[in-house]
């Protein structure tokens, strides 16, 4: 929960994790508007950890109330540890697949493969399919679910009950938008090749990236944010500096 983020962050800092140095604007942007805090890195292993307190930024046009997710989370062997419920795991994957605001972490084929695997795995659990669409409606994620099921079935022949697809029929966009989105998603999912780049794939990824930002923030805030980011790039400020590497250079 969000009210425990500071406690979790401090405990990690006490146990070998450190904050990566970023521009003060970026740090404030994370902590005030986003669904996570800036990533932490382990001083020995070099691994990064993201601490999330909700699925989407506070400013997102889609509902992002995390309370239902925590309420339905399932305990693991250690009662202090929980994982999302099956339907919520699928929706979490789809939300980040279709609404990711980082151009390096956007639509990737491997992430849709993950969705396919989740659907096939949880299909064996009684009540999973019956709960999936109602849960998406409750959380406001019908559209990402609609796109995800369509493309998983189209690319991987994921076995999805017809009743589930029928229940999502009213969540699909109108025909022109549906055709454009299907085209963009299909091309954005194509694996990139450094020697033979496919320009339509790059354009599709960029357009979906713009769309994700449009959905993440109201226009006024988005304009200010993009202007600030452009100014930081103009100044030549590096997005992230590894403090461990700086320490090595100083020795």
Range-by-range predicted roles:
Residues 2-251:
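Conserved NTP-donor binding/palm subdomain of two-metal-ion nucleotidyltransferases/polymerases, i.e.
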